[in-house]
Amino acid sequence: MCFRTKLSVSWVPLFLLLSRVFSTETDKPSAQDSRSRGSSGQPADLLQVLSAGDHPPHNHSRSLIKTLLEKTGCPRRRNGMQGDCNLCFEPDALLLIAGGNFEDQLREEVVQRVSLLLLYYIIHQEEICSSKLNMSNKEYKFYLHSLLSLRQDEDSSFLSQNETEDILAFTRQYFDTSQSQCMETKTLQKKSGIVSSEGANESTLPQLAAMIITLSLQGVCLGQGNLPSPDYFTEYIFSSLNRTNTLRLSELDQLLNTLWTRSTCIKNEKIHQFQRKQNNIITHDQDYSNFSSSMEKESEDGPVSWDQTCFSARQLVEIFLQKGLSLISKEDFKQMSPGIIQQLLSCSCHLPKDQQAKLPPTTLEKYGYSTVAVTLLTLGSMLGTALVLFHSCEENYRLILQLFVGLAVGTLSGDALLHLIPQVLGLHKQEAPEFGHFHESKGHIWKLMGLIGGIHGFFLIEKCFILLVSPNDKQGLSLVNGHVGHSHHLALNSELSDQAGRGKSASTIQLKSPEDSQAAEMPIGSMTASNRKCKAISLLAIMILVGDSLHNFADGLAIGAAFSSSSESGVTTTIAILCHEIPHEMGDFAVLLSSGLSMKTAILMNFISSLTAFMGLYIGLSVSADPCVQDWIFTVTAGMFLYLSLVEMLPEMTHVQTQRPWMMFLLQNFGLILGWLSLLLLAIYEQNIKI
């Protein structure tokens, strides 16, 4: 009966899908063709290879195994010569070792086991054919473990990458396969259903063996060839941008800028740089709708020359893909490649050295710079605790604290408004690095400075109203009216150090507030009351420690995302957080001391809570490789900065009172202006920062 009529019903669909007949006696396909056909290494694939030819075997187990052994044991030699085929192994013995019988139909498991035995035969053919090794005397498990233990110095439970390469090297020499382009080992393992990074195990090795035998009989080169596969280049480009299967437009822009930055153009001088003004490298989303009409217009010098036009990433997508795509697949990228090469050859987008885009930070730079930044942040927080030690003059302490509070408000709100929010909205990417276009490309910065001016203006009005209208008898008060929720609002009592130094009870160490003053005058009650007070104080210290730890964790997360984006973003975010941490830690340290803790214990707890910033940092670095994740972290960070600066700290600056109100007013404004000015300069010149 015909071979195809004896197939089981379950194999019929596989044969319908594999309608193209392969022949090992004709021209051999390339690795690229094999990938496009998507051979799965299933029994149907192997049997179809055996069925090719003038006299396909019947679906009889013994006949099929004999044909397979002949094709494997006697592969076609070079120059089309076919020598005598002397099989060193009987088909019946091969079938019995694999667990099969002489029935008419081969099972999938048997075909895979036979393939594994054939791999062993190929590797040890010399010993087998010289009668030094008799395969009939061993069971299947022996050959399975022998292949898994191909290298004695590696794990015998898995077929490692090196062991797989060794096997493929044998097959390339054994079969007549092309050495120019080969299917890579990782691709072969993936097609064989191997997902573990350690390699094939006892259950998946037979599948891999069937795939190797099938593709080798089809003439496909496997493993490391003389030349890489065509997919290697696309995969390298995508992996360099931390992507796997798709690119975003922003990442394609980054790739184009990198290519234009590194390219050395030798071009006729009549191609002028001002041509780029007609069509900027980075196309604004709001201007994209006018692209077609603008390119059809004639310039003053005549029609627009495509040879001198610099196309943006979005325009290349429109030209080649004829549709607006937010994600670009590997096939789409291959289709666009001629346009990218043309842009490099024409030098239309070549940038001067002082305008070249900076490359994204490497992994070493991200982890190195961010670790240094968080270390400085930790030391800065300890500086805040050191300032508390000079609290003998309470009035001077309060003035210094308000100076840092003003600086924190300026840097936090400035970083959120001038850097984080524009970056989330993509305004940084729309800046055109053109001479004479400074005010146009930085226009959003001046508008945001107007917003900051409005905040500062109303702060001045309210502060002046309080200073000029409030009764003079209230100027001597030193409490923050109604603000007890944040640690910045707390001031030390002038007797704090003396009391702590003498080891007085916690009930006598109080913050300067009316309720606390009354409590300070009360004698220490019974032991029960004292114990209750100690429990309350311990709870307060724990709350401060937990809250400070979460706060520092969020700071580390923000710094990690910032340095993942760019070194400039990391610097600006670090400065903003550092200016905020000093007054924050001063307040927290004051609360810990006032709760009855000793100086050493308070410093230790403050230091331990600051270490959570490193935890947040490395989590932020690991999860923010995706630009989308970076944007969301920046969004939340901007909201946190605005809340801390405008909701928590700015009202404190408005209502705090002192014996020298005008001095405090000047110091607060000095801190505000210094913080905003620093972030303004960073927003303007951040591209010039070189680390």
From Swiss-Prot:
Any GO BP: zinc ion import across plasma membrane
InterPro entries according to UniProt: ZIP, ZIP4_12_EF-hand, ZIP4_N, ZIP_Transporter
UniProt main location, coarse: membrane
Molecular function GO labels: monoatomic cation:bicarbonate symporter activity; zinc ion transmembrane transporter activity
Reaction(s) this enzyme catalyzes, per UniProt: Zn(2+)(in) = Zn(2+)(out)
PANTHER family: SOLUTE CARRIER FAMILY 39, ZINC TRANSPORTER ZIP12
Function text: Uniporter that promotes Zn(2+) import from the extracellular space to the cytoplasm across the cell membrane. The transport activity is temperature dependent. May play a role in neurulation and neurite extension. May play a key role in maintaining intracellular zinc content at levels that reduce the inhibitory effects of rises in oxidative stress on spermatogonia and spermatozoa viability during spermatogenesis.
Protein name per UniProt: Zinc transporter ZIP12
Gene that this sequence comes from: SLC39A12
